[in-house]
């Protein structure tokens, strides 16, 4: 039991957030609502779990209301599988052999998960995991992962955090590159960090005449001053 359990390593932060694991049944969400904690949805990595996601949050809300608590979607974490590369074909090449062994030797062979059958080939594994309706993984480009995360937001009605499941489908180098691509291109996009840049660019495009007039006014001011005009001339002819 957990009666005499102790942590061997204490957390670095004094106030540590708690999250209840949730799969397909209402149990995890109900427990989170009862105690007002966050949720870690690991069922999102299976087809049945994905199908259950749209109704999952209501279990937490109902339990929270019953016990006088409040739950916030920002505390809902969704776990996802992915391997990202510059192209879909490259991601496929990098992940297929490791995915094949992971499924056949670990998930089906060691864990013997109910309903999980071994793949017959590496390519079949990639197709079934990432390129069918209800696929549980993203094996592709940063844009593919961005699109899938946005689909998950629509499917669930909104959540707070995406957590990538660390696996060993690809080599250490390619796995590191995958996470680098996620950090560089996926995180800024899904967190809205690029919105201001795009708005600024669009403003410049739509107000080009205003900027041109300002530039002309500056040039007129320079040319009306003999010393300034000479300095500009020298600067423009300098090697």
Residue ranges and their predicted role:
Residues 27-57, 75:
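A conserved active-site cap/scaffold subdomain adjacent to cofactor or substrate pockets
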């Amino acid at each position: 039991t957990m009666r005499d359990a102790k942590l061997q390593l204490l957390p670095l932060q004094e106030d540590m957030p708690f999250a209840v694991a949730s799969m397909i049944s209402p149990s995890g969400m109900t427990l989170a609502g009862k105690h007002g904690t966050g949720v870690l949805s690991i069922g999102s990595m299976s087809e049945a779990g994905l199908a259950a996601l749209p109704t999952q949050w209501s279990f937490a809300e109902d339990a929270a209301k019953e016990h006088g608590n409040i739950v916030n979607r920002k505390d809902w974490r969704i776990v996802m599988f992915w391997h990202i590369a510059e192209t879909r074909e490259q991601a496929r090449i990098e992940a297929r052999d490791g995915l094949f062994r992971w499924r056949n030797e670990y998930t089906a062979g060691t864990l013997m998960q109910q309903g999980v059958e071994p793949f017959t080939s590496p390519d079949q594994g990639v197709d079934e995991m990432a390129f069918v309706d209800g696929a549980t993984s993203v094996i592709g480009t940063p844009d593919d992962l961005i699109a899938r995360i946005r689909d998950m937001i629509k499917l669930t009605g909104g959540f707070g955090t995406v957590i990538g499941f660390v696996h060993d489908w690809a080599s250490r180098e390619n796995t590191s590159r995958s996470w680098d691509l996620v950090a560089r291109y996926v995180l800024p996009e899904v967190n809205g960090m690029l919105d201001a840049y795009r708005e600024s660019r669009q403003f410049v495009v739509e107000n080009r005449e205003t900027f041109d007039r300002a530039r002309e006014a500056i040039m007129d001011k320079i040319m009306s001053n003999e010393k300034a005009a000479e300095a500009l001339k020298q600067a423009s002819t300098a090697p």
